[in-house]
């Protein structure tokens, strides 16, 4: 295999969450947001994974939708995941782990954004 030039518009990047702490909201996450904005502005694609990790950051993510159809799809996805959690008696807004809390995360919003 040899490296070859390509277009950013031909690439798709999957973004996976790592361990959240009190600094990730001012370091890694903003950098990945700017990276995503750059990739998308140049015709590429970024994909966030782990929808439950987005609970608490819905409004911020929805504000980045390119059009109303995308916004509606995102709202539906969030609502469907929340209904799944409710149907299986799983807590939605109690996600921070002991490790997150030790790192300075106190709420789901802190974890989702940081």
Question: Which residues does each predicted region cover?
Answer:
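Active-site cavity-forming subdomains of large catalytic enzyme subunits
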Residues: 1-3
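Anaerobic metallocofactor- and corrinoid-dependent redox/one-carbon enzyme cores
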Residues: 10, 15, 21-114
